[in-house]
């Protein structure tokens, strides 16, 4: 089963991912995007460049995702592992959809169309919901993807994705304390996963 953690920068999802990884290691593969591969490193360089071309950046993200799927996610699923990924395809749709909003019409649909041949849909997505101002303040707005105005557009895209497949998403209030958010995530996974897969 493929579980993804999604949310705005500053939502605390990586803190949750780290907590889950520290307490669940038997039969669970923990991974993240961007990856540590050469493709993921190229993504990180692009993220920090204010003048990066948004179309080129989309294809960097897509290449990293395709490599991640073939090298990590699919083999782990084939072994019968639960895979928990800190960011996955929905991040691409929400973030690159916002980045390209002034470049191509129906930007999020454009991104999904490019990305979907190279992905495998998640089974469960925990969405850590936080308002854009809080997300920007927590993250420190260290790059172009972390300003409150940009995150507002990203959040609107996430809401649209939730409307598309509401049965896949579990919304978690990320304005709570880290301990409460982690507890909610643990409870959501206990509900979503078979007993023998999550103990």
From Swiss-Prot:
<dbReference type="InterPro" id="IPR027417">
    <property type="entry name" value="P-loop_NTPase"/>
</dbReference>
<dbReference type="InterPro" id="IPR018094">
    <property type="entry name" value="Thymidylate_kinase"/>
</dbReference>
<dbReference type="GO" id="GO:0005737">
    <property type="term" value="C:cytoplasm"/>
</dbReference>
<dbReference type="GO" id="GO:0006227">
    <property type="term" value="P:dUDP biosynthetic process"/>
</dbReference>
<dbReference type="GO" id="GO:0005524">
    <property type="term" value="F:ATP binding"/>
</dbReference>
<protein>
    <recommendedName>
        <fullName>Probable thymidylate kinase</fullName>
        <ecNumber>2.7.4.9</ecNumber>
    </recommendedName>
</protein>
<dbReference type="InterPro" id="IPR039430">
    <property type="entry name" value="Thymidylate_kin-like_dom"/>
</dbReference>
<dbReference type="GO" id="GO:0004798">
    <property type="term" value="F:dTMP kinase activity"/>
</dbReference>
<dbReference type="GO" id="GO:0006235">
    <property type="term" value="P:dTTP biosynthetic process"/>
</dbReference>
<dbReference type="GO" id="GO:0006233">
    <property type="term" value="P:dTDP biosynthetic process"/>
</dbReference>
<keyword id="KW-0808">Transferase</keyword>
<comment type="similarity">
    <text>Belongs to the thymidylate kinase family.</text>
</comment>
<keyword id="KW-0418">Kinase</keyword>
<feature type="binding site">
    <location>
        <begin position="7"/>
        <end position="14"/>
    </location>
    <ligand>
        <name>ATP</name>
    </ligand>
</feature>
<keyword id="KW-0547">Nucleotide-binding</keyword>
<dbReference type="Pfam" id="PF02223">
    <property type="entry name" value="Thymidylate_kin"/>
</dbReference>
<keyword id="KW-0067">ATP-binding</keyword>
<keyword id="KW-0545">Nucleotide biosynthesis</keyword>
């Amino acid at each position: 089963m493929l579980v993804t953690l999604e949310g705005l920068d500053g939502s605390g999802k990586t803190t949750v991912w780290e907590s889950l990884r520290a307490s669940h290691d038997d039969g669970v593969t923990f991974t993240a995007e961007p990856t540590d591969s050469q493709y993921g490193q190229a993504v990180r360089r692009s993220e920090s460049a204010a003048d990066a071309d948004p179309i080129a950046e989309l294809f960097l993200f897509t290449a990293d995702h395709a490599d991640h799927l073939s090298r990590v996610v699919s083999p782990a699923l084939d072994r019968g592992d639960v895979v928990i990924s800190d960011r996955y395809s929905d991040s691409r749709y929400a973030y690159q959809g916002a980045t390209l909003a002034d470049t191509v019409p129906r930007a999020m649909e454009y991104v999904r169309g490019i990305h979907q041949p190279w992905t495998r849909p998640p089974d469960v997505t925990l969405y850590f919901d936080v308002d854009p101002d809080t997300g920007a303040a927590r993250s420190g707005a260290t790059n172009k993807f972390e300003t409150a105005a940009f995150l507002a557009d990203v959040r609107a895209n996430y809401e649209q994705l939730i409307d598309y497949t509401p049965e896949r998403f579990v919304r978690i209030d990320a304005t709570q304390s880290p301990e409460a958010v982690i507890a909610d995530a643990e409870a959501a996974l206990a509900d979503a996963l078979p007993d023998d897969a999550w103990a």
